[in-house]
């Protein structure tokens, strides 16, 4: 089984996501469509690792927006997100390949992290990288050092990226 551990803020929404009502939980339809295309290509299951899982309103909103979750990582408030992912994996030995998509690096150093910028959300380049990784075409993840993030943001702005 293939699994994507998904953060939502900064991945399925970004600084450019329209939110005229200033709702606390919002998904950008363009970014969600890109994510759904990734899921269709890979057949991966989605485990929510986002802070949205702590709040019933967040979980409701994820379902309302159509985020296709099968499970959530355990709530370990004194532990980094890395430990929550590893605890979930320990309970699910049938996972052969997984990726973490998160705009932050919460001690995810030794996990396959694909890290979009919160300014752009999930880009097509990162979605392709995740798909290639889950399909075993590469072992390269896409974590971003600060300078890489700056360059990604410049590139996205030059392309007039709209989410």
Q: What name fits each language-model region?
A:
Residues 1-41, 45:
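Active-site neighborhood of HAD-like aspartate-dependent phosphohydrolases
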Residues 2-4, 44-47, 97-99, 113:
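Hydrophobic beta-strand segments of well-ordered beta-sheets in folded domains
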Residues 6, 49-52, 101-103:
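Short His-Asn-centered micro-motif
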Residues 12-13, 54-56, 106-108:
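Short, active-site-adjacent cap segments at secondary-structure transitions
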Residues 28, 51-53, 78:
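Generic structural signal for well-ordered secondary structure
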Residues 39-59:
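Substrate-recognition element of Asp-dependent hydrolases with the DxDx(T/V) motif
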Residues 59-163:
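C-terminal cap/substrate-recognition subdomain and adjoining C-terminal extension
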């Amino acid at each position: 089984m293939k699994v994507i551990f998904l953060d939502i803020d900064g991945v399925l929404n970004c600084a450019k996501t329209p939110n005229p009502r200033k709702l606390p939980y919002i998904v950008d339809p363009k970014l969600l469509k890109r994510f759904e295309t990734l899921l269709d290509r890979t057949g991966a299951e989605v485990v929510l690792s986002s802070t949205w899982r702590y709040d019933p309103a967040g979980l409701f909103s994820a379902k309302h927006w159509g985020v296709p979750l099968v499970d959530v990582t355990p709530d370990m408030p004194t532990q980094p997100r890395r430990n929550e992912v590893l605890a979930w994996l320990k309970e699910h030995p049938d996972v052969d390949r997984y990726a973490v998509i998160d705009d932050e690096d919460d001690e995810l150093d030794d996990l396959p992290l694909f890290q979009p910028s919160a300014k752009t959300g999930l880009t097509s380049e990162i979605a392709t990288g995740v798909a290639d990784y889950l399909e075993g075409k590469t072992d390269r993840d896409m974590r971003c050092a600060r300078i890489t993030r700056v360059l990604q943001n410049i590139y996205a702005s030059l392309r007039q990226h709209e989410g």
